[in-house]
């Protein structure tokens, strides 16, 4: 099932606007003991190598598909199959070997 993108974007922007207006109207109660300096950890954590996998990041930047727009667009199309990708205008000359005459 293909979902048209324009109504989805309009609905999401309406929901975001409603949430922002609701957040602006609310009066949160601020407790000073919740935001004190004593609640924060004293020791610095430093670099956590468990979450910074540099070898994986380097291999991603050195691959042939890095900044390959064909692969990136195909990845987005496969990640979001419910979006009607035929709705968007095609950019001339991107998929053909020779650019189309303008």
Curated annotation (Swiss-Prot):
Q: Where is the secretion signal located?
A: 1-22
Question: Which biological process terms from the Gene Ontology are attached to this UniProt entry?
Answer: cell differentiation
**Recorded name of the encoding gene:** Krtdap
Q: What's one Pfam family here? A: KRTDAP
Query: What protein name does the entry list?
Result: Keratinocyte differentiation-associated protein
- Per the record, the domain of life is Eukaryota
Q: Which UniProt keywords apply?
A: Differentiation, Secreted, Signal
Classification via InterPro entries: KRTDAP
So what does this one do?
May act as a soluble regulator of keratinocyte differentiation. May play an important role in embryonic skin morphogenesis.
Q: Which GO terms describe its cellular component?
A: extracellular space; lamellar body
Which organism's genome codes for this protein? Mus musculus
Report the subcellular localization.
Answer: Secreted
In which tissues does this protein get expressed?
Answer: Expression restricted to suprabasal keratinocytes of the epidermis.
